[in-house]
Amino acid sequence: MLIGGAQNRLYQLRTSNILGLLRTRSALRVGSKVELRCPYNNWTNLGRSHFSSTSIPPTFKSKTFGREKGLLAHNINVKRLSSTVSKSKLPNEDTAHNASEKNSKKTDTKAVNISELKILKDLFKYIWPRGNTKVKVRVLLALALLIGAKVLNVQVPFFFKQIIDGMNVDWSDATVALPAALGLTIMCYGLARFGAVLFGELRNAIFARVAQNAIRNVSLQTFEHLMKLDLGWHLSRQTGGLTRAMDRGTKGISYVLSAMVFHIIPITFEISVVCGILTYQFGASFAGITFTTMLLYSIFTIRTTAWRTRFRKEANKADNKGASVALDSLINFEAVKYFNNESYLANKYHNSLIKYRDSQVKVAQSLAFLNSGQSLIFTTALTGMMYMGCTGVIGGDLTVGDLVLINQLVFQLSVPLNFLGSVYRELKQSLIDMESLFKLRKNQVKIQNCSQPKSISKSDGPFEIKFENVTFGYDGQRKILKNASFTIPAGMKTAIAGPSGSGKSTVLKLVFRFYDPEEGRVLVNGVDVREYDIDQLRKAIGVVPQDTPLFNDTIWENVKFGRIEASDEEITRVIDKAQLSDLIAKLPQGSSTIVGERGLMISGGEKQRLAIARVLLKDADIMFFDEATSALDTHTEQSLLRTIRRNFNSGEKTSVYIAHRLRTIADADKIIVLEEGTVREEGTHQELLARENSLYKELWRIQEDLDLLEDEINHEKETLEKLNKSI
């Protein structure tokens, strides 16, 4: 009963305070219900998570609602109210990227139409790089070995013909011995076969380094290009599909290079040589059949493969979708478990697999049709040539050895022809895979240095940040900041407060140059941030975000990520300053403990301390704390705030605190309150509380009242527990 009474007072106080805000906010009536526009988009943003240990009644009635401002609502559902408020038409920066995704994808589609010829041309730059003599020598040597292997390979049927013709004697006569010339021909036959294989393997070994270097360079340059793309581009992409596209693209490069050097060029050379030999040895009729066969075979293969290409594209699309679903599910494993949505995601993944299966079945069926057609064309030609050869032997124009030579030459073409079909097929598929990779490289880098960027260094600090009439929106339509102007003083602690979606976190993104403003300027020490060198600007800014991004590596390596070149002594020092030493001492593996993917193996407070250690190591002159303590309990929050004050409140650094919890910023030298993308008010904590109609004052009163009631509830809980124990 004690706790229940406190809870009811908590609900009533929350209700009355919300109604106080309604005096300065709008209320939208929808039917017999009322949608409330509140400065915060959900209940927890009005204070701490007050209902974490208490249950919220599904509905509550209050006559106060009916009397206040003529509102006619008699029964307001808390969940509906929370949902309604969160859907209020405030510029929501958390969801602003959804609209930009469509625009981004449209832009990408227009910008990255790449032909297969263009892909091969771009790839050739890596096979024949300018100024790299070693690679060029390897390529030329590989081509020489290729030609040598094919010349020896064509000689094999001639040696075999001579052996057959040389055997055309009466071996029943005991006086007949194996001629020395025939023995030499047999040896040459064996050497030619072995030489062709040896030259081919040497070619493979020599060209392997060229191919792998090309793959390495393309992959590295693609990765570096992706790292340069703006934040909006990355937020509009699914990581699983992106990594799968890169993986398939690099494999496609490997196949294209091997196909070009090991198959297409050798096959073309061998077909030309065989046609020439047949024309010279046996007349134009044999060469004509051979040439016609090659032509029909190639046309059929190319047209059928072009028809099959769309099935491969469908399979790739389904594969990307499945990979994205799987990766998202694994990354958000906890959320999946919290909401018991394993079956939903399994079904979603299953649907992607079904689409992939159907596409792959079509690929296999069309492959069977292609192989059958190729075999029909080749077998028909071979049968016709054998008939002509047999007719020539019977007529005395050809020897048995000539018939064997024709058969060997044509059969020798069957292997490269079969390869030609599969190579062209795989080449087309690899080019499709490579197209996705090369498309990534064609995306425009929007945030770039100007022609003559200015440097920024510690000697220029402390830094003043100034926004001059800044307007910005993530999708170009809904504006998050609207003609906003304010100054963050140098070397002081400045806080930015306001409702969700008012543009608080956008301030950080614009200063850091994740984005550039549509209108106005962002100045650091009087210089537009667009005039600074991007790398130097970002080195001067340290960020402790609400959800610290950690790598699946050790604590030591995650801290070291703040400044890779830092010494062990420096890393140890910042670990001590961030009060991580006690945690590390308790761990069996100490600082070598793996934190898990995204830091899931350590608590929220420990993650934030690790983030503080990381930015301490970076030693930036401008510090942003973006809701750094909002996800922590009160005790951990206060402990972390003491650590932050101890390390960052000197006059040497400019500190900016973005916060919903106003208690955490009450000691700030300046507080800037944003509302709907504009500056509502600014001043110190005491100055803002002293003002009439102050938004900050209203928010402060609500949070303070809720904090007091939370303390009362906790006290009543403790009292009840003591009573239970005494009983």
UniProtKB/Swiss-Prot annotation:
Bias (Basic and acidic residues) occurs at 90-107
Positions annotated to bind ATP: 474, 498-509
One GO cellular component term, please give it. Answer: mitochondrial inner membrane
- Where found, per UniProt? Mitochondrion inner membrane
Could you point out where the transit peptide sits in the sequence? 1-25
Pull the Mitochondrial matrix topological domain ranges from the record: 26-138, 208-256, 303-368, 425-727
Q: What protein name does the entry list?
A: Iron-sulfur clusters transporter ATM1, mitochondrial
Species this protein is from: Candida glabrata (strain ATCC 2001 / BCRC 20586 / JCM 3761 / NBRC 0622 / NRRL Y-65 / CBS 138) (Yeast)
Gene symbol here is: ATM1
